[in-house]
Structure formats: structure tokens, C-alpha cells
Design a protein with these regions (language model features):
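Secretory targeting and sorting signals
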Residues: 1-36
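A short helix->beta-strand "capping" segment at the edge of beta-propeller domains
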Residues: 36-57
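A short beta-strand motif characteristic of beta-propeller blades
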Residues: 46-53, 88-94, 141-147, 181-188, ...
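Beta-rich, blade/repeat-based domains predominating
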Residues: 52-70, 96-119, 127, 147-164, ...
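Short loop/turn segments immediately following the C-termini of beta-strands
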Residues: 75, 116-118, 169, 209-211, ...
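A short loop-to-beta-strand structural motif that recurs across blades of beta-propeller domains
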Residues: 79-82, 131-134, 173-176, 215-217, ...
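Short loop/turn segments that connect beta-strands within beta-propeller blades
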Residues: 83-88, 136-141, 177-182, 220-225, ...
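C-terminal closing repeat unit and adjoining cap/tail of repeat-based domains
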Residues: 252-305, 309-325, 329-332
Length: 332
């Protein structure tokens, strides 16, 4: 695709600003094998990624509820979709509600989705925090405002105590919404913050820095004024464009990357690649429950609208069940 066409297509997307710059630099060409090293395999080599769903839009974020249903935000149409099981056709849950940011599922099953992840709101979000966090009913698609007064929302994370954290990619702001509704758009600051997650015990917030000096930060919840740079990407990954973030069952961060096509995992003080070859990835998440997008399975979403299961990232799945699940997904 010509650069002019790429810029025109992606001009409205804050995350795509980095993509366009990467294209101009030529980094969307194949990345050398000297990118993040492969993670050590625990056993036999895993099966390759399998496509399990397709959406008609740039998928910005995905999350799975306890019933094994996946929910996705679609950047260009601003819609929220529900996919009931691998191989199922997506159900359009909402119209264009501006749902172009992250999505999380609350314990009661309702969704929280971010808005304002366009270029204008992202670049001005630190100065003019006017974006909303919306609450969406997973059955009816009914929409209400959960919180407002946040910077343009890219990433969304939910803490065990119900606190919500957000990122604004075009600035530095990390927002916080407490369970009693208090909003602080400047709770903490990290350069070019993108993917976000909360440690299992709720004591730290993990944030991905996407550009300039990609890496991973830890923000102590008790001391948000002092974020700590935890891991820096290697020199060969300076243009990898890390994006969405999730945690595995051991609390280790996994990160989707745009340009390198790798899914990284944080191990100790370094990053390794769980999987490669999935270019323009935006988010990764684990399934839940015993059916559908089930527990222990890792899923990836991307700019291409495709959802893949990534067996290399699976955990806690008996070998027979894993093989059966993959066969079912291929059939779908």
C-alpha cells in the first residue's frame, strides 16, 4: 500500500499514528529474526495460530466473559461486537457509540468500553480530558455513561477492587476511576502509554510504552507519582510498536505488537516471544469458562479484523482438550 493511502486510511486513529510513522520508516517490512528471542518451550512445539473469528473492521480490543463469549471494540465503526464461540458470526451489539478504545468485563458481566481513541482526543487528552467510559449491557447492547472527564481512552484495565485505569496514547496520562465514581485523568504519567493491566493483587499497574523507547512500566498504586521502568525492549525492537497487554495465570504480562508481529511475554527482566508472524496485532487476552473462548486459551486480535487462537500461549489445558479445541476451531 502506498504511504499516502496508508496515511489517509489510518488518519483518524491515534494508535495508527505510530503505524503510519512506522510505514514511513519502512518498519512494516518483514522484521529480522533478531527480534525478541523465542520463549523457552515447556514441552513439544505448539501448533500454529488458528483463525477463529473475523470482524469487518480494525479490532482495537477484546475481552472474554465468564460464559466464554468474546467482546470486541471496532475502531472505525465505533461498534461493540459479541462473538458467542469460536467459528460463530459476530453479533453487532451496539451502533456507533464511539467505542474505539479498550474493553473489559466487570464481575457482573457488564462491559466497560473506552471512547476518544481518535487522533484529536488522544493528542489533546492531557489538556482537555473530555472522553467517556461507557457501560454496555452484554445482552441488549444498552449503553450508559459510566464515567466522563478522561483523556482519549486507548487502554482500559479493571482492578480486583473495581477501580478502572485508562491510558491516553497521544499524551502521558493514566486515568483512574474509583468504584464510588471519582475520576482523576492525571492519576499517573507514562510516555506514550498504550496497553494496561493490573497485577493480580491490585498493588501495581502495568503500562506499555509504545514508541520512542518501547518498554513496560510498573506503577505502584500507593505511589503513582513514581512509575518505574521495568523492562525495555531490545535495540532490534525499538520499532516493534507494542500495543495491548494482558496477564497470564502466573501474573506475567503478555504484549501484542504491531510491526514485529510477535507476542511478547515478560520473564524476569526481559522480553521473549511466545509467537511470531501475527503482524499488526492490537490485543491479546485469555479465555474464561468451560465453553466458547474457554479458560487457558490465548487469543489475539488485529488491525485485519481477525481473531486467532494462539496455542503457544495456552496454559493449564490437557493435551487432548487442546487438540480437540483446535480441531473444532478449524472446522468453524
Amino acid at each position: 500500500m502506498r504511504l499516502r493511502s496508508l496515511l489517509h486510511t489510518f488518519s483518524g486513529n491515534a494508535a495508527a499514528l505510530a503505524l503510519a510513522a512506522a510505514a514511513a520508516a519502512g518498519v512494516l517490512a518483514p522484521v529480522p529474526a533478531a527480534a525478541a528471542p523465542a520463549c523457552a518451550a515447556a514441552g513439544a512445539p505448539a501448533a500454529p495460530p488458528v483463525q477463529v473469528a473475523q470482524l469487518p473492521d480494525w479490532v482495537e480490543s477484546i475481552a472474554v466473559d465468564r460464559r466464554g463469549r468474546m467482546f470486541a471494540t471496532a475502531y472505525f465503526t465505533g461498534r461493540v461486537y459479541r462473538i458467542d464461540a469460536p467459528g460463530s458470526a459476530p453479533v453487532t451489539l451496539t451502533g456507533n457509540i464511539g467505542a474505539n478504545g479498550g474493553v473489559v468485563v466487570r464481575p457482573d458481566g457488564r462491559l466497560l468500553v473506552g471512547t476518544g481513541n481518535d487522533l484529536a482526543h488522544s493528542l489533546t487528552g492531557d489538556l482537555f480530558p473530555v472522553s467517556k467510559l461507557l457501560e454496555v449491557d452484554p445482552e441488549s447492547g444498552e449503553v450508559s455513561t459510566y464515567a466522563s472527564g478522561l483523556g482519549g481512552i486507548d487502554g482500559v484495565a479493571l482492578a480486583p477492587d473495581g477501580t478502572v485505569y485508562t491510558t491516553t496514547l497521544g499524551g502521558r496520562g493514566i486515568g483512574r476511576v474509583t468504584p464510588d465514581g471519582r475520576v482523576d485523568p492525571h492519576w499517573a504519567a507514562v510516555p506514550q502509554p498504550n496497553g494496561i493491566a493490573v497485577s493480580p493483587d491490585g498493588s501495581e499497574v502495568y503500562v506499555v510504552q509504545t514508541t520512542v523507547a518501547p518498554g513496560l512500566y510498573r506503577i505502584p498504586v500507593g505511589d503513582p507519582a513514581h512509575p518505574r521502568r521495568w523492562i525495555s525492549a531490545g535495540a532490534s525492537d525499538v520499532l516493534a510498536l507494542p500495543d495491548g497487554l494482558t496477564l497470564d495465570g502466573r501474573g506475567r504480562p503478555l504484549i501484542a505488537t504491531h510491526a514485529s508481529g510477535q507476542i511478547w511475554r515478560a520473564e524476569g527482566g526481559s522480553l521473549c516471544a511466545v509467537e511470531s508472524g501475527l503482524r499488526l496485532s492490537t490485543q491479546v487476552t485469555y479465555g474464561q469458562g468451560e465453553r466458547g473462548f474457554s479458560a487457558g486459551r490465548l487469543y489475539r486480535a488485529g488491525v485485519d479484523g481477525r481473531i486467532h487462537e494462539v496455542p503457544a500461549g495456552a496454559e493449564g489445558i490437557p493435551e487432548a482438550a487442546g487438540a480437540a479445541g483446535t480441531a473444532e476451531n478449524k472446522a468453524g
